[in-house]
Regions:
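Long, hydrophobic, amphipathic alpha-helical segments used as structural scaffolds
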Residues: 33, 91-94, 98, 137-149
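Short, intrinsically disordered, mixed-charge
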Residues: 23-24, 81-89, 128, 132-139
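Terminal, regulation- and interaction-focused segments at domain boundaries
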Residues: 1-20, 66
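Long, contiguous binding/interaction regions
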Residues: 98, 108-110, 116, 122-135, ...
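Short, highly charged C-terminal tails/helix-capping segments
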Residues: 142-166
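Short, internal acidic amphipathic alpha-helical interface segments
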Residues: 66-103
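Short histidine-centered catalytic/ligand-binding loop motif
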Residues: 6-7, 64-72, 116-119
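Ser/Thr-rich, low-complexity intrinsically disordered terminal regions
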Residues: 20, 24-48, 52-63, 68
């Protein structure tokens, strides 16, 4: 298989695109470094802390969307089951549980291999998908964590409630 040579031309940092997106939408943000930016977005159910990280070694823009719902140790196994049931339904991105901190988050990445540059539309779509997915399943996580429901009960109840909204 022939190798393809790519020119090492300077590229626009994808986090510059994300920063412009945050500024245009008047979202609070903090640029911790050239490779990381965190945006605060208010949702219907909770506030979201969205961190974008540029991973130059694999040429990917990683998104992690966390929300304030700590999972107590006694509910982690059921939340893990719920995450598995939800992730089966998702076409892109996935939920994760950071066990050491009991923190839930939605993760996704945009691969920009070969010098491809991120567009505003791509960064906006990445964020939109994360927020929509978190909003859709937030109540399921609440039902398991706070109401003591099983993963299946929580998912069924949340999907029923969501389908009833206009």
């Amino acid at each position: 298989m022939p190798q393809i040579a790519y020119a090492d031309e300077p590229r626009i940092n994808p986090l510059d695109v994300v920063e412009r997106l945050a500024a245009v939408n008047d979202w609070s943000f903090e640029r911790a470094s050239d490779d990381e930016i965190t945006i605060l977005v208010t949702g219907k159910w909770t506030d979201y802390q969205v961190s974008y990280t540029w991973m130059g070694d694999i040429e990917a823009l990683h998104l992690a969307c966390a929300f304030d719902l700590k999972v107590p140790e006694r509910r982690r196994a059921e939340v893990a089951t719920l995450i598995s049931l939800i992730n089966e339904r998702l076409w892109v991105g996935h939920f994760d549980l950071w066990v050491t901190e009991g923190m839930l988050m939605f993760r996704h990445a945009l691969v920009l291999a070969g010098g491809t540059e991120a567009s505003g539309k791509q960064c906006e779509a990445l964020l939109g998908n994360a927020l929509d997915t978190c909003e859709r399943y937030f109540t399921s996580f609440q039902f398991v964590v706070w109401a003591g429901k099983s993963a299946r009960e929580a998912l069924d109840a949340a999907m029923f409630d969501t389908s009833g909204e206009a």
